């Protein structure tokens, strides 16, 4: 797949661009990189022009200083600008959905539609912030990979965990490159993100919600309330 790079504030940002047609941007989540979308790429590449970035600090992209949901949405906007694109549909998974919401707030004119894939427009609750702080302490003590090995199986339903153990183990092994600095920066950025539920209320473009019945990370009632 065509691999491209963007220099953003002195850091190299990697993304893939494939296909032709209307542009769809897929933004991965925490503890992932753009390869998580490979099956979607295979299915959609003959129908759309797909842009799949590695977020700063993930995959082949370098971490940028002072990372926030807003600065990562700025990176996505710069990719679109570099490719002379003025519109797209954007789908964000988990943390990628938080970035999509920041993009919708600051660059709404670029969006034909957007979607939240197991994600939310709401900020972290105090309980969630406490959980993230515990995660940060675990990362500091045991390292990034041990943390990802501990939490990643929780992203899959009990049925999937049983049926796809080999695939899940392979996916987890692919995450060994992550650094503590990157994961801690992501957690701190997610803890600081604001409530963007009003963006959904005010949006004039179609919005897609993909909700998991067995999602243990994003409360399903919060997602249903936002729909």
Question: Residues of each region from the PLM?
Answer:
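Active-site loop/oxyanion-hole signature of alpha/beta-hydrolase fold enzymes
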Residues: 8-11, 16, 39-42, 51-91, ...
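Active-site glycine-rich loops that stabilize anionic/oxyanionic intermediates
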Residues: 21, 29-32, 94
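The conserved beta1-alpha1 loop
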Residues: 27-29, 211
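Serine-hydrolase catalytic-loop signature spanning alpha/beta hydrolases and amidase-signature enzymes
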Residues: 29-39, 50
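Alpha/beta-hydrolase active-site loop signature
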Residues: 31, 55-59, 121
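Conserved hydrolase catalytic core segment
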Residues: 43, 85-125
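Conserved loop-alpha-helix segment in the C-terminal half of the alpha/beta-hydrolase fold
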Residues: 202-227
């Amino acid at each position: 797949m065509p691999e491209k790079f963007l220099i953003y504030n002195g850091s190299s940002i990697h993304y893939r661009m494939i296909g032709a047609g209307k542009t769809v941007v897929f933004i991965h989540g925490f503890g992932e990189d753009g390869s998580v979308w490979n099956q979607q790429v295979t299915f959609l590449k003959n129908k759309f022009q797909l842009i799949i970035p590695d977020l700063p600090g993930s995959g082949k992209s370098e971490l940028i200083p002072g990372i926030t949901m807003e600065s990562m949405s700025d990176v996505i906007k710069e990719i679109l600008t570099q490719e002379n694109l003025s519109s797209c549909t954007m789908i964000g998974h988990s943390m990628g959905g938080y970035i999509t919401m920041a993009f919708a707030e600051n660059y709404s004119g670029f969006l034909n539609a957007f979607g939240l894939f197991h994600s939310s427009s709401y900020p972290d609750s105090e309980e969630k912030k406490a959980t993230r702080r515990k995660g940060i302490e675990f990362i500091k003590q045991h390292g990034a990979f041990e943390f990802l090995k501990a939490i990643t199986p929780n992203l899959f339903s009990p049925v999937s965990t049983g049926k796809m153990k080999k695939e899940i183990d392979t996916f987890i092994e692919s995450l060994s490159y992550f650094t503590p600095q990157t994961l801690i920066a992501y957690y701190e950025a997610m803890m600081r993100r604001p409530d963007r539920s009003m963006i959904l209320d005010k949006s004039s473009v179609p919005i897609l919600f993909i909700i998991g019945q067995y999602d243990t990370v994003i409360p399903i009632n919060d997602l249903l309330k936002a729909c």
